[in-house]
Amino acid sequence: MKILVIQGPNLNMLGHRDPRLYGMVTLDQIHEIMQTFVKQGNLDVELEFFQTNFEGEIIDKIQESVGSDYEGIIINPGAFSHTSIAIADAIMLAGKPVIEVHLTNIQAREEFRKNSYTGAACGGVIMGFGPLGYNMALMAMVNILAEMKAFQEAQQNNPNNPINNQK
């Protein structure tokens, strides 16, 4: 299975940006940790990473995933979580599972950070666990996709399914 990981604005500055909140781990290290998690778990997963500081590029990347071989999206939209209805709309039209990740617990931060338009459009939100949150999202995504596949196979093999009885 192929999973797209989208990283939003300022995440390229992890390791330098407010270490008290975000720690010293860089974005590249987070991606390496995710790849190691895939290998150690013998998961049949291919990850593609994309980072941008531009809202439109995030929307473009989500739209490019429509009809592609990406089965799911893990996204940290950064500050766009609190402002971007356009990214939320793109998430809703993606037609695949999307999980939002935040390194910090946005509910415990400034009032303006507590609302997440994008999180409301996602199947789930993982926040406050630092870099571990990405592996948590990855684990959830793998399970969601496996359940979806099992359900589809069960539907295809069900002799009572009217679609299977068409001639």
From Swiss-Prot:
What GO molecular-function term can you cite, just one?
3-dehydroquinate dehydratase activity
State the EC number(s).
4.2.1.10
Q: What class of enzyme is it?
A: lyase
The entry describes its oligomerization and partners as:
Homododecamer.
- Pfam families according to UniProt: DHquinase_II (PF01220)
Protein keywords: Amino-acid biosynthesis, Aromatic amino acid biosynthesis, Lyase
Q: Which domain of life is it from?
A: Bacteria
Function field: Catalyzes a trans-dehydration via an enolate intermediate.
BP-aspect Gene Ontology terms: amino acid biosynthetic process; aromatic amino acid family biosynthetic process; chorismate biosynthetic process; quinate catabolic process
The pathway that the record names for this protein is: Metabolic intermediate biosynthesis; chorismate biosynthesis; chorismate from D-erythrose 4-phosphate and phosphoenolpyruvate: step 3/7
> What name is this protein filed under?
3-dehydroquinate dehydratase
Q: Identify the InterPro entries for this entry.
A: DHquinase_II, DHquinase_II_CS, DHquinase_II_sf
Q: Which family does it belong to?
A: Belongs to the type-II 3-dehydroquinase family.
Catalytic activity line of the entry: 3-dehydroquinate = 3-dehydroshikimate + H2O
